[in-house]
Regions:
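A short helix-loop-beta-strand connector motif used in the catalytic cores of GNAT acetyltransferases and
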Residues: 44-61, 70
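Conserved acetyl-CoA binding element of GNAT-fold acetyltransferases
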Residues: 81-92, 120-121
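Conserved catalytic-core motifs of GNAT/GCN5-like acyltransferases
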Residues: 120-121, 134-161
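Conserved beta-strand in the GNAT
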Residues: 61, 67-76, 84, 89
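Conserved GNAT-fold acetyl-CoA-binding loop/helix
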Residues: 26-49
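Conserved acetyl-CoA-binding loop-helix of GNAT-fold acetyltransferases
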Residues: 90, 96-109, 134
Length: 179
C-alpha cells in the first residue's frame, strides 16, 4: 500500500526553501526544452513572492509519510468557490511514482466546496498537459498565444515558451461552470 500523501500549510519561515524547491522542479522542463537558464530562476523570486501573498493564496507542502515531496499554491475564493491551482510541483527525485495524482486528490479533498478549479501550464510542458487532462480530469478551455493573449497575465515573460500556454478548468461533480 502506498504511503499516505498529506498537505500542510507552509509557514513564513518555510518560504525560502519552498521557493528554491519549486524553482528547481520548474527549471527541469525549461532546460530540457530551451537549454540552460540565462536570466535567473523561474518563476522569479518576485513572481513567487506575489503568488505567496496574493489574496486567498494558500501555500501547501505536499508530504509523503511526513517527508516533503512537493508543494502547491492555491487561491481559494470562498464566495464564488472558483478556485485556482496557481503553482504545483513534485520534487524531481520523487517523479514517476504517482505522487502528483495522489497530491492533486488530496488538494481536492482539502477543498470539498470547490465548484470549479482553474489552472494553466506552458504549451511546451507536455507532461503537465497529460497530467491535468488525462490524469486529473481537467479540460482545456483556452490556448494563449501571439494572436490570443492571456488577459490574466499581460506581458508576463518569465521564461522561454511562456507566451504560449493552455488554460484548464475542472468542474467538480455536482457543480456547473459559471464563467
Amino acid at each position: 500500500m502506498p504511503e499516505p500523501i498529506t498537505l500542510a500549510e507552509a509557514h513564513p519561515a518555510d518560504l525560502p526553501a519552498f521557493r528554491k524547491n519549486l524553482q528547481e522542479a520548474f527549471a527541469l522542463a525549461v532546460i530540457e526544452e530551451f537549454g540552460p537558464l540565462q536570466d535567473g530562476p523561474i518563476p522569479s523570486d518576485e513572481d513567487l513572492d506575489s503568488a505567496f501573498a496574493a489574496p486567498g493564496a494558500e501555500v501547501l507542502h505536499i508530504l509523503r509519510d511526513g517527508e516533503q515531496v512537493g508543494g502547491a499554491v492555491v487561491t481559494i475564493n470562498t464566495t464564488t468557490k472558483q478556485n485556482a491551482l496557481d503553482l504545483f510541483f513534485i520534487s524531481p527525485a520523487a517523479h514517476g511514482q504517482g505522487l502528483g495524482h495522489r497530491a492533486w486528490t488530496a488538494i481536492e479533498q482539502r477543498y470539498p466546496d470547490t465548484r470549479v478549479w482553474h489552472t494553466h501550464t506552458p504549451y511546451f510542458e507536455k507532461r503537465n498537459i497529460h497530467f491535468y487532462v488525462n490524469k486529473c480530469g481537467f479540460k482545456i478551455t483556452a490556448f494563449y498565444n501571439a494572436r490570443h493573449a492571456d488577459p490574466n497575465r499581460p506581458g508576463t515573460q518569465d521564461f522561454p515558451g511562456v507566451d504560449e500556454a493552455f488554460e484548464f478548468e475542472k468542474v467538480m461533480p455536482g457543480a456547473t461552470a459559471t464563467i
